[in-house]
Design a protein with these regions (language model features):
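Conserved residues at the C-terminal ends of beta-strands
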Residues: 261
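Active-site-proximal, substrate-binding regions of enzyme catalytic domains
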Residues: 2-254, 264-312
Length: 312
């Protein structure tokens, strides 16, 4: 019995968010093969990253591993729509799912084949959709240019002594953890206030489950990684990529983690889980932790995860 079979049998069906860089991996194939109940969760950004008007063949090739498991693929709603969901109405992992796109995934793969075989009308439609996806991606990534100002604003919640402590490799003290939570809350409230149309606040119990708060939390962990290393700037193209990495880490906290080969994504996700659980937020178990336990290994500590990001 393989490791994925072992943890699926013990823990039940697993739902794991898949990064673009893991779409064609043997790990994903093993995960889906282990149980017909396991699910590969695809956020909109995963499709957007692969959806390029001039290279639809790469899109088809990128789906080569998951295509035979089309009924195990779950497509999420757009991040903008998810940001408006109120967790008081329905638990977010269920409410996030785009039922229509999920049901149509297998058919989409077949249409992609037909388009690439020369069916002009389908090819045109897919290229138009790809152009739309790239436009949406550009809108989302636009805010990445504000990185230096955002970092300085976040760092201002901590004292010079706090920052020095972090740069010496110290972990967050309880007081610093409280400051972190305050900073994250301030960012989330600011987003609520600046929304183009009014957003409904959830109950205090469900505030940590709202996507805006959860993404602000993961983004705060991302900011901490730069404060700890004394880095005050980020190349625009890297900052744009980081936006997607943090979003994937955020999605992973709603499911059984994120399957990714990216150090930043894994770091932000792991530390965010650790801090959320320290705040009393209940999360589904991370599949990597389940694998480590099944193999008799301890999962990485927050300090070990922090060291993995050096040089990212």
């Amino acid at each position: 019995m393989g490791m994925f079979e072992a943890i699926s049998e013990k823990s039940g069906p697993l739902r794991v968010v898949i990064d673009t860089n893991a779409l064609a991996s043997d790990e994903l194939r093993a995960f889906l093969s282990a149980s017909s109940e396991n699910r590969a969760i695809l956020p909109d950004y995963v499709a957007m990253e692969r959806f390029k008007p001039d290279n639809l063949r790469a899109l088809r090739d990128g789906f080569s591993v998951i295509r035979p498991f089309a009924d195990q693929v779950v497509i999420l709603k757009g991040t903008g729509e998810i940001s408006r969901l109120n967790p008081d109405a329905e638990p977010l992992p269920q409410a996030m799912v785009d039922a229509d796109q999920t049901e149509a995934f297998g058919e989409f793969c077949e249409l992609l084949d037909r388009a690439l075989e020369g069916e002009a009308s389908l090819l045109r439609q897919l290229r138009e959709r790809a152009e739309w996806a790239q436009t949406q991606m550009s809108v989302v990534l636009k805010g990445a240019s504000d990185f230096p100002a955002d970092l300085a604003e976040f760092e201002a919640f901590f004292t010079a002594s706090d920052v020095a402590h972090m740069r010496r490799g110290g972990t967050l003290t309880p007081e610093m953890h409280d400051k972190f939570d305050t900073a994250v809350g301030a960012v989330a409230h600011s987003i609520f206030r600046s929304a183009p149309s009014p957003l409904t606040y959830p109950s205090p119990k469900n505030w940590p489950n709202h996507f805006i708060l959860r993404n602000a939390f993961c983004n705060g962990v991302y900011m901490l990684s730069f404060i700890q290393r004394g880095i005050g700037a980020r190349k625009p193209e890297k900052a744009r990529n980081d936006v997607v990495d943090v979003l994937l880490a955020t999605y992973g906290t709603y499911f059984n983690g994120v399957m990714s080969n990216d150090d930043l994504t894994n770091h932000v996700h792991h530390i965010s889980r650790f801090l959320l659980e320290a705040d009393g937020v209940r999360l589904a178990p991370d599949y990597l932790q389940l694998l480590a336990e099944a193999a008799g290994h301890e999962p990485p500590t927050p300090d070990e995860a922090a060291r993995s990001i050096e040089g990212a």
